[in-house]
Amino acid sequence: MSISGAVDEAGTPLLAVTVDYRNKPAVKSSSGGWRSAGFIIGVEVAERFAYYGISSNLITYLTGPLGQSTAAAAANVNAWSGTASLLPLLGAFVADSFLGRFRTILAASALYIVGLGVLTLSAMIPSDCKVSNLLSSCSPRFQVITFFSALYLVALAQGGHKPCVQAFGADQFDEKEPEECKAKSSFFNWWYFGMCFGTLTTLWVLNYIQDNLSWALGFGIPCIAMVVALVVLLLGTCTYRFSIRREDQSPFVRIGNVYVAAVKNWSVSALDVAAAEERLGLVSCSSSQQFSFLNKALVAKNGSCSIDELEEAKSVLRLAPIWLTCLVYAVVFAQSPTFFTKQGATMERSITPGYKISPATLQSFISLSIVIFIPIYDRVLIPIARSFTHKPGGITMLQRIGTGIFLSFLAMVVAALVEMKRLKTAADYGLVDSPDATVPMSVWWLVPQYVLFGITDVFAMVGLQEFFYDQVPNELRSVGLALYLSIFGIGNFLSSFMISIIEKATSQSGQASWFANNLNQAHLDYFYWLLACLSFIGLASYLYVAKSYVSKRLDTS
């Protein structure tokens, strides 16, 4: 962030709280901005190529070479995805408290390469088993242990990589400079654009290799991609801005002290609190009066906290209602790599007489719609909205997220209607008892729900990224992005829990469950209608919470 009047010998403005790779004050003209962000977005493209090379087709590997049932495989995918989305909390803690973002990215990249290498070796172990109805695999025990150990090592590596790379990229822009502040908002759009470009390449190339050539090769290529990501990251070292961490207390300790002090001072009178507020110069506003019970931490009786520390603690606490009301959106988001993929496997997938599209490749329509829509959103819709609202982002971050949640509700309605059509077609052609038969219904029927998912992500996903980066204290921005990712971690676990409960409840008395291995006897349409109802309730809850949200005070010093 810039300091007025701070210049080098050539008259180039310097930046405070940031240094260059030589540990000297960063010079604005030769560091940061898009020159640095380009390298970091390149790293994200390669990393997402590697990650989705594993996750996008994971359910096919589990139900194929490892021989798990559909319900068991979906539960395992959700459990792993949930873990991968929660581990960024650990990675962000390590980065913001100890290593810093850049060093954490380096360590996570090395761990990533090791995990993907072991995963490749596990796929080379021969396996010959039929589909199991148990939650365990029928593959050789050593293969299963090696595979899942490597899989969760990849999740751990992703936990250190994901929040730090994005926060490190956003750190390259000075939010107090109007032009760089505007560029930072665009950075989140183009970051997601790059991420989806990497995902799109994975879905068209790697999924075909995994389904038709070799799983070992399909897992080995992501390992090579992570080596490339590490090289690209190092190439940009000379251009990066590195944030300087304060040498006093950890931000976690400072925030924790506020909560502890407020509890210790719980019995102090309102007059004492008012006196402390006046003594410290706390301005009465909506921000200061929200969570006013924390203002008791300002009373010197049992340990006083500063106003800045109080605001840090409040800014974290304000995120909780938004976080909670977005969980249903995360449950909906978890369905595309699981049941959507299994649906596609039952449908007519021929493009040419000799080529069938991989079911997992259908997920590419999510990325494709994002790649197409983000430039339209960033270059057309936002300037139009900006001319009316005079806001740098055109619309607020909360409005953007709410629009995405509404679109996720529409996506589940469309998914339910399409599945009803697929089941009717299977019944009309007498294929209800033929799980291996191809339902004479084009797989392109699934495209609208995938496209809606993509447009939903442009609004909700990118909005959540920017919101959780922007609304936390500066020193906790890796944690802010980890909190955003944890929404999807908990969402995946909730999805897995729902699947397990519904599987047990609907398979009693020998009846086919909603998630039967034979999808022509299953009722995924019921599950999608349930998610649509939950999405509507989640949207209503979100709108109620967002209406009363108080934004973080901007430090103008």
From Swiss-Prot:
Modified residues (Phosphothreonine): T104
Transmembrane parts of this sequence: 49-67, 79-99, 105-125, 144-164, 186-206, 215-235, 320-340, 365-385, 401-421, 443-463, 479-499, 526-546
Annotated signal sequence range: none
Annotated tissue distribution: Expressed in shoots, roots and stems. Detected in leaves, flowers and siliques.
Family note: Belongs to the major facilitator superfamily. Proton-dependent oligopeptide transporter (POT/PTR) (TC 2.A.17) family.
Record's subcellular location: Membrane
Membrane topology value: Multi-pass membrane protein
PANTHER family for this protein: OLIGOPEPTIDE TRANSPORTER-RELATED (PTHR11654)
Superkingdom, taxonomy of origin: Eukaryota
Organism: Arabidopsis thaliana
Alphabetical keyword list: Membrane, Phosphoprotein, Transmembrane, Transmembrane helix, Transport
Example GO molecular function: dipeptide transmembrane transporter activity
Protein name as annotated: Protein NRT1/ PTR FAMILY 5.10
PROSITE patterns in UniProt: PTR2_1
GO cellular component: membrane
